[in-house]
């Protein structure tokens, strides 16, 4: 907050200006320009076209964007700091809420880091890896559907918005049946998953894939060759390979330059090397190319999910080492709150040593050897990386997320400066930022 004293016309006046970062320099530069030619406009943080609480500081001349800056931090939640006060397993509940449109990717990246520090990456059961891939690819479909639905809505295409959200409900219903929650389920755990798939899960997933085909086809029929849609997106938000490399851009934006960069292929994890799928690219470098990549990636994700159903074999859903395995067979009591009498009897009926170990595991958590690792997964928005540091205790010393939304937002100026204000809406929609991941 800055106080500016002004004595225009002999009357003293104090103006309080709320600013952040280089906001004052932006205002000073605008004031020094010729009067009536350029104005500074705040687009957001409460604006329907900024995908959340994103603030865009625009300097415009007529309808042309001369300068564009991003103002972030309005959704800061302190998740990374909170992780330092929670056990390693409890951290999953926090990280799943970062990028809230792709929670399974947040959870998987975190768990892969913990498992790498523990040195148990190769001990993860095969069924666990298949379930993780299954959930991530279903999550990729639901995330892309939101990107296309909201992007269409912002450009005036209301029907694709209804189609996209209706299709997303199919996926979220699956998540609820498998994990108990539609979003932020904390289902992926270090060493495995919280619980096995329900008995009829494979049948329901296969049926959901059949239901998804119609809305995906309908989305393509509505937009792929739509003249208005192409006019609003082709040649808009242009960013070539050189710009992407300079800014560290990943995901559909990078692949729209023709570079087939996908961590599922270049640095496989969770057994992705055993799945057949194509890395979708485009060479248009614009918003339309990114749209087409997301449309085609949903079909590739469906292919991967079908392969997951074929690979599902009976087996454990948690590592066998009981010193590390979080109790994953909890049963809810008849009141829906506490543990069931059957589960309590199982714990209390075991040996005293087993009971003590169970108590210490739940109340103190596991100890992770000292060290630091970096792991990354290919999220719907690009490279989601985790830098994890352990001091040998039961809590993380530091966990830092490299969220693709944060990095990709750096391209707003390169995409939008020199273009029209209306085209800025399409450019930001093609970036598909999620502010929960940006601010954390």
Curated annotation (Swiss-Prot):
Keywords: Acetylation, Cell membrane, Membrane, NAD, Quinone, Translocase, Transport. The keyword Acetylation applies. It catalyses: a quinone + NADH + 5 H(+)(in) = a quinol + NAD(+) + 4 H(+)(out). It is found in: Cell membrane. Its EC number is 7.1.1.-. Its main location: membrane. One of its GO terms (molecular function) is quinone binding. Gene3D superfamilies: Cytochrome-c3 Hydrogenase, chain B. Signal peptide: none annotated. The modification N-acetylthreonine is found at residue 2. InterPro entries: NADH_Q_OxRdtase_suD, NADH_UbQ_OxRdtase_49kDa_CS, NDH1_su_D/H, NiFe-Hase_large. Belongs to the complex I 49 kDa subunit family. NDH-1 is composed of 14 different subunits. Subunits NuoB, C, D, E, F, and G constitute the peripheral sector of the complex. This is NADH-quinone oxidoreductase subunit D. The lineage of its organism: Bacteria, Bacillati, Actinomycetota, Actinomycetes, Mycobacteriales.
């Amino acid at each position: 907050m800055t106080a500016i004293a002004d004595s225009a016309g002999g009357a003293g006046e104090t103006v309080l200006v709320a600013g952040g970062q280089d906001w004052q320099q932006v205002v000073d530069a605008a004031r020094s320009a010729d009067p009536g030619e350029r104005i500074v406009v705040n687009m957001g943080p409460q604006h329907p076209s900024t995908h959340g609480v994103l603030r865009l500081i625009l300097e415009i001349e007529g309808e042309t964007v001369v300068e564009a800056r991003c103002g972030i931090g309005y959704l800061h939640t302190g998740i990374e700091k909170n992780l330092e006060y929670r056990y390693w397993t409890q951290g999953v509940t926090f990280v799943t809420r970062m990028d809230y449109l792709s929670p399974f990717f947040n959870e998987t990246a975190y768990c892969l880091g913990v498992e790498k520090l523990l040195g148990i990456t190769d001990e993860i059961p095969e069924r666990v890896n298949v379930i993780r891939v299954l959930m991530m690819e279903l999550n990729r479909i639901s995330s892309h559907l939101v990107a296309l639905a909201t992007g269409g809505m912002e450009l005036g295409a209301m029907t694709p918005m209804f189609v996209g959200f209706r299709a997303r409900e199919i996926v979220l219903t699956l998540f609820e049946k498998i994990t108990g929650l539609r979003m932020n389920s904390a289902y992926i755990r270090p060493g495995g998953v919280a619980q096995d798939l329900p008995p009829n899960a494979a049948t329901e997933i296969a049926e959901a894939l059949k239901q998804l085909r119609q809305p995906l086809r309908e989305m393509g029929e509505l937009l792929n060759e739509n003249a208005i849609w192409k006019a609003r997106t082709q040649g808009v938000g242009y960013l070539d390979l050189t710009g992407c490399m300079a800014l560290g851009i990943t995901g559909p934006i990078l692949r729209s330059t023709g570079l087939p960069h996908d961590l599922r292929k270049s640095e496989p994890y969770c057994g992705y090397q055993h799945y057949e799928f194509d890395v979708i690219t485009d060479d248009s470098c614009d918003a339309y190319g990114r749209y087409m990549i997301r449309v085609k990636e949903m079909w590739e994700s469906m292919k991967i999910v079908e392969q997951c159903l074929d690979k599902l074999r009976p087996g454990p859903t948690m590592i066998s080492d009981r010193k590390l395995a979080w109790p994953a067979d909890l049963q809810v009591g008849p009141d829906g709150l506490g543990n069931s009498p059957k589960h309590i009897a199982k714990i209390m009926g075991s040996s005293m040593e087993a009971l003590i170990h169970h108590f210490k595991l739940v109340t103190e958590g596991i100890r992770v050897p000292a060290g630091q690792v970096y792991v990354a997964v290919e999220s719907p928005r690009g490279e989601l990386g985790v830098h994890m540091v352990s001091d040998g205790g039961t809590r993380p010393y530091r966990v830092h997320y490299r969220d693709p939304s944060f990095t990709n937002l750096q391209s707003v100026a390169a995409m939008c400066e020199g273009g029209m204000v209306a085209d800025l809406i399409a450019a930001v929609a093609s970036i598909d930022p999620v502010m929960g991941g940006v601010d954390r």
